[in-house]
Amino acid sequence: MFCPLLAVASASQTTAKVDLVVVNKSESRLSVMRDGKVIKSYLIAMGDVPSGHKLKEGDQRTPQGRYILDYKKSDSAFYKSIHISYPNEEDKLRADALGIRAGGMIMIHGENPRSSLPPKEAQKYNWTNGCIAVTNKEMDELWKMIDAGTPIEIWP
């Protein structure tokens, strides 16, 4: 039996605005949350070196810590993207103390347009330079749920 009210509730649940994004690097998962509850979870691809905190530009690592998703870019080279405010002040101080450049331009973005793999297959591999990648279809969902200013926590 089809229940239209349940279909509408389910669809609106995945497009409602979220108040936190959590990335669990060890599980290769991005979860969107509202009021402390997971709304939806996605399999992600990350940098070629997925373990450890990003220390410097070019290290192929995805940063760890608390950041802000500070702006959206609809004309990204990887479909659409949402910018992560890396480096934060702590990251900058660490890099300065080590005499290195912290890097930047870390994003949540869509698929690699040059990949010959089907989107879900490509998500099984870490292929970014430190960004967090989802499929284009998933990026469309995230685009609707995430506003600029939403916090993101990236866990080891």
Locate predicted features.
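Bacterial N-terminal signal peptides
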Residues: 1-7
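N-terminal post-signal-peptidase region of extra-cytosolic proteins
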Residues: 12-19, 26, 46-71, 89-94, ...
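Well-ordered beta-strand positions in beta-sheet-rich domains
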Residues: 20, 41-43, 66, 105, ...
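Short Gly/aromatic-enriched secondary-structure transition segments
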Residues: 37-49
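Exported/periplasmic cell-wall-interacting domains
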Residues: 16, 71-156
